[in-house]
Amino acid sequence: MMKPVLTTIAVAALAACGDREVVVGEDYQRVLDPLAREIDKLDVLFVIDTSGSMQPEQQALVDAAGTRLFSQLEQDLGGLPDLHVAVITTDVVIARPGVPGCLSEDLRDNGRFRVGLDTIGCPGIDGRYLIDEDDGVGGRRRNYQGTLAEAFTCAASLEIGSGCGFEHPLEAARRAFDGRHPDQLDFLRSEAMLLVVFVTDEDDCSASSGELFADPTAGLDSPLGPRTSFRCFEFGVVCDGDQPRVFGEKSGCRPRDDSPYLTPIESYRDFLAGLKPDPSLVMVTGMYAPPTPVVVGQEPTGVVRPDFPALQPTCVAPATGVEATPAIRLDALVQQFPSRFVFESMCESEMSQRLYRIARSTAGVMSRSPCLLGNVDITTTTERCRAFDVAPDGSQRVLSGCRTANEQGCFHVGPSQTCGYTPHGVAARYRGTLAAGHRLVVDCLAPVGR
């Protein structure tokens, strides 16, 4: 079972933590790891699902991005960062002709930056992605006409309904930067934060070959099973008991690392982390359904056949009514970026609220905010965390947790009004002054159930 990047402590390691009540052997996860310095450059890649069910969510995205993403970044950072913004779809060439809506030839998409509708484009945008950056003489260098919100609205207005129902968001993100599109490589700047935003109502189905989509007339007696999106779950995820076609609720579901058909999650984690010289400059966010509960039931009547197994929707998105199924692989990937991931459930808030929190979280990382990101909640306190004073050369010393309100030379974890944009509103601070160039790095035990 793959877990987020974390560490397991032994008894000896507890001595430096004093007498705090910590469960020996439990896993800590990094929740605060500030950049060495504040940065003002941001590369943003949107990976958008263009399957038919996503039309309301795509419209909500383009309607809200101007005020809830770009304007919020400008407000939080005291000015708009130097921006590169690109859009791709979840469609890639799957090397298997005849799959409705899916690419069998390298004609478009396949990791290519998209600028609006394929037949029209965006005449006001000069290039394959948006540029809005300081020109060095007090102004801005832009490659678009009108406002940034208007330009993004056009760029992100794609052919919804034309997309493949076997979504490949992770493979699409890789193909955007793996060298097959040389004109896109200048999008990435070594000194800029990279923010990857996945927007989809289904889990990742990034296949390692076209064999997953073979045998289009297969039934329940076929090893592959019916050619529906359930194949992505059956061969991309493993749950306790490993009987994917049996109806009912599943437990312990995680990416199937030994899948003969889907690419392992670690491959995408390593690729994305390697896009910047400093992996801490890579941030991954997602708008998708929570990975639980996982329930297998009947295909909706009239879609294929009611006796065929199907992954049941986890929830329905507010305002848009989009049904979303559990994104187990995608969630596992996002959580491989400790203190650099933001999960925004498609089920619990509207698009404008999701973009607001993503913008504020991104600005927080860029400005070295003390707000914790990751698997923490309002019950996370100093007693459930450990902290380090990390020097510029990477050496570190263990810090003790504060036991009283006035104690100095220690770290404290607790609620903070400045972190209200996070799901938990928790921050970590050092009481005292760290040496110049030193950083406060914090690990915490995950909440029960995560």
Where are these regions (language model features)?
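Sec-dependent signal peptide recognition
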Residues: 2-8, 329
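C-terminal motif of bacterial Sec signal peptides marking the signal peptidase cleavage site
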Residues: 14-16
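Divalent cation-coordinating acidic motifs and surrounding scaffolds
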Residues: 18-450
